[in-house]
Each structure stands twice: as structure tokens, then as C-alpha cells.
UniProtKB/Swiss-Prot annotation:
GO terms for biological process: arachidonate secretion; lipid catabolic process; phospholipid metabolic process. The active site is at 75, 119. It catalyses: a 1,2-diacyl-sn-glycero-3-phosphocholine + H2O = a 1-acyl-sn-glycero-3-phosphocholine + a fatty acid + H(+). The lineage of its organism: Eukaryota, Metazoa, Chordata, Craniata, Vertebrata. PLA2 catalyzes the calcium-dependent hydrolysis of the 2-acyl groups in 3-sn-phosphoglycerides. It comes from Laticauda semifasciata (Black-banded sea krait). Residues 22-27 form a propeptide. It is an enzyme of class 3 (hydrolase). InterPro entries: PLipase_A2 (IPR001211), PLipase_A2_Asp_AS (IPR033112), PLipase_A2_dom (IPR016090), PLipase_A2_dom_sf (IPR036444), PLipase_A2_His_AS (IPR033113). Binds 1 Ca(2+) ion. It holds the Pfam family Phospholip_A2_1. Its EC number is 3.1.1.4. GO terms for molecular function: calcium ion binding; calcium-dependent phospholipase A2 activity; phospholipid binding. This is Basic phospholipase A2 cPm05. Residues 1-21 form the signal peptide.
């Protein structure tokens, strides 16, 4: 084998090892990002909502900092209710469509309907709520009490 081939093979192996250490996104999160993009007609990337205020992103505590952050708290609460119903909202896949009037759900099971409704409500709330750049990546230990 040629030295150049060995280098390429080594590089591929190393990159695969690095990729295996990246945890996968919850299945539903991918669908939720598409609902957000459909609802806001692509005006803001979904990742802007991942670390916003006290509730947008992982966890949440305290008083929401604004209307958009309240959307995230309502979404968190909705997922909590889904869990009480025996659903797994972060893993529940559902059918949805992005029409000219925005996104809508088209699902079969109770859990799919409930989780899709949670995500749809949040996506529409995000689309109508102002985004304040000052509330992105805030110090939650100080502002979320």
C-alpha cells in the first residue's frame, strides 16, 4: 500500500472516531426545527432559539425574560404533560406538513398528535414573538431566578 493511501485511511478512521463521540440529536428535535422554519418562513434559523432566555434550550428555571422565552416555557410544560400521558416527546416522531398557511400536524396516535401540537404551538409562538438579541446566551445563574 502506498504511503498516501495509508494517510487517507488514517484520516478517515480518525474522523469516524470523532464523529462517534458526538451524541445524536433527539429524533423529534429535527422535526421541531423544520416546524420552526416553516412557521417563521425561514426568517430566523432554528439554532437561534437553542440558547435564548431562561427556557429556550435544555432545562429552564425562573421567570421567562420575554414573550419568546414564555413560548419556550409553555413548550417545556407541554412536553411535561405529554410525559405524564406516558409519551416520550423528545423521541416521538409525527407527520406534519408545511403548507402555504404554515405548518400543520397530520398524525395517527394520541402521543404523536399531542407532541406535534406542542411543537406546532411553540413554532407559531416563536414566529409571532419579537427576538431580542440581548436575551441570547444570557447568564442564567443571574437572570433566571
Amino acid at each position: 500500500m502506498y504511503p498516501a493511501h495509508l494517510l487517507v485511511l488514517l484520516a478517515v478512521c480518525i474522523s469516524l472516531l470523532g464523529a462517534s463521540a458526538i451524541p445524536p440529536l433527539p429524533l423529534n428535535l429535527v422535526q421541531f426545527t423544520y416546524l420552526i422554519q416553516c412557521a417563521n418562513k425561514g426568517s430566523r434559523a432554528s439554532y437561534h432559539y437553542a440558547d435564548y432566555g431562561c427556557y429556550c434550550g435544555a432545562g429552564g428555571s425562573g421567570t421567562p425574560v420575554d414573550e419568546l422565552d414564555r413560548c419556550c416555557k409553555v413548550h417545556d410544560d407541554c412536553y411535561g404533560e405529554a410525559e405524564k400521558m406516558g409519551c416520550y416527546p423528545k423521541l416521538t416522531m409525527y407527520n406534519y406538513y408545511c403548507g402555504t398557511e404554515g405548518p400543520y400536524c397530520n398524525t395517527k396516535t394520541d402521543c404523536q398528535r399531542y407532541v406535534c401540537a406542542c411543537d406546532l404551538q411553540a413554532a407559531k409562538c416563536f414566529a409571532r414573538s419579537p427576538y431580542n438579541n440581548k436575551n441570547y446566551n444570557i447568564d442564567t445563574s443571574k437572570r433566571c431566578k
